[in-house]
């Protein structure tokens, strides 16, 4: 191969998406820089040592040891738990993530879930399967209360897309003093949370998984929800107590659930959630759209421009570390 590039894209794709479109998107946005794709492990080993910017799903310790010139690693995932973060930090490498790039697609999927419950589209499909032309009554979203737990990029995108449906929105976040786009906003304090849940028609979980949010929705919270309420989880499976959710669904304690994430995940083929008619299940595909690479390329291109303009690492977009 020729001289090392300015930006190296590692070979592993994500969510069924090949990396070639990512390379093309970066080249369009960085016309003055050499962007190369490492198609093989040998390419990665050959090009990494003198490349200042590497981007991809992950970087293993063996390759990192060889990446002497590495200044910035742009992770193609929102989560970075799989990265050798200590080794990256020790080498002074700036790490950014893909946080926010999935928000539009996930928010659209949330609306799809909610409207499926509102308009009883599952019942329509069942009658179609039976070739049964018999009317049934559905409802309207207008006048409903939608509660969103987590007001980051995904939660904010959900609220934005609910505008025009004439609904009341309640937001809950770890730092309610920051405010938010919802009509009301609370923290995760138990009393405040239950007050919100008692008035909720559709509960959307869009918060990160932390020690605070793990098991946040359990038996008590599900009992507070009205029986007509539906739960939508596009966050992380363990935010909901699965056994408690199963009990609520089986007893009609809540109307239904739409789950893009589960606990456990992947969901075993013999898990009872598969058999419940009042459950919508998708295999963690809420953010799986062709816009993944263009949005990620936008972030990386903006960050490289900022660095060229003299910005510090902490001024970059989606920076994971250094944090201060």
Residue positions per predicted region:
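N-terminal glycine-/charge-rich "phosphate-binding" loop or analogous flexible N-terminal tail
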Residues: 1-52
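Hydrophobic Val/Ile/Leu positions in short beta-strands of Rossmann-like dinucleotide-binding domains
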Residues: 9, 146-148
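Phosphate/diphosphate ligand-binding glycine-rich loop within oxidoreductases
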Residues: 49-125
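C-terminal helix-to-coil terminal segments
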Residues: 89, 97-109, 265-324
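Phosphate-binding beta-alpha-beta segment of Rossmann-like dinucleotide-binding domains, i.e.
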Residues: 93, 99-145, 306-307, 311-319
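Glycine-rich Rossmann-fold phosphate-binding loop(s) that bind the pyrophosphate
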Residues: 151-152
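N-terminal Rossmann-fold NAD(P) dinucleotide-binding loop
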Residues: 155-156
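Rossmann-like adenosine-cofactor binding region
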Residues: 176-272
């Amino acid at each position: 191969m020729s001289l090392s590039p300015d930006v190296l894209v590692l070979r592993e794709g994500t969510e069924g998406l090949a990396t070639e479109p990512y390379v093309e998107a970066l080249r369009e946005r960085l016309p003055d820089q050499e962007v190369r794709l490492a198609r093989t492990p040998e390419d990665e080993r050959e090009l990494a040592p003198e490349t200042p910017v590497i981007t991809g799903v992950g970087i293993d310790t063996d390759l990192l040891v060889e990446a002497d010139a590495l200044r910035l690693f742009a992770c193609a995932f929102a989560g970075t738990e799989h990265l050798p973060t200590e080794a990256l930090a020790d080498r002074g490498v700036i790490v950014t993530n893909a946080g926010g790039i999935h928000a539009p697609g996930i928010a659209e999927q949330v609306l799809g879930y909610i409207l499926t419950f509102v308009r009883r589209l599952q019942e329509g499909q069942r009658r179609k399967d039976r070739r049964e032309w018999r009317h049934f009554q559905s409802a309207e979203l207008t006048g409903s209360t939608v509660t969103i737990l987590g007001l980051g990029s995904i939660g904010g995108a959900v609220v934005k897309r609910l505008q025009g449906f004439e609904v009341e929105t309640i937001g809950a976040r770890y730092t309610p003093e920051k405010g938010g786009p919802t009509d009301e906003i609370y923290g995760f304090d138990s009393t405040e949370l239950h007050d919100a849940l008692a008035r909720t028609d559709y509960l959307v979980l869009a918060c990160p998984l932390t020690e605070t949010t793990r098991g946040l929705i359990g038996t008590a919270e599900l009992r507070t929800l009205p029986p007509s309420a539906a739960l939508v989880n596009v966050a992380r499976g363990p935010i909901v107590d699965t056994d408690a959710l199963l009990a609520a669904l089986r007893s009609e304690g809540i109307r239904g659930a739409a789950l893009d994430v589960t606990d456990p995940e992947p969901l075993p083929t013999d898990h009872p959630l598969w058999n419940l008619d009042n459950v919508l299940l998708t295999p963690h595909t809420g953010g799986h759209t062709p816009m993944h690479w263009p949005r990620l390329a936008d972030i990386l291109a903006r960050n490289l421009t900022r660095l060229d303009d003299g910005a510090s690492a902490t001024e970059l977009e989606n920076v994971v570390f250094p944090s201060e």
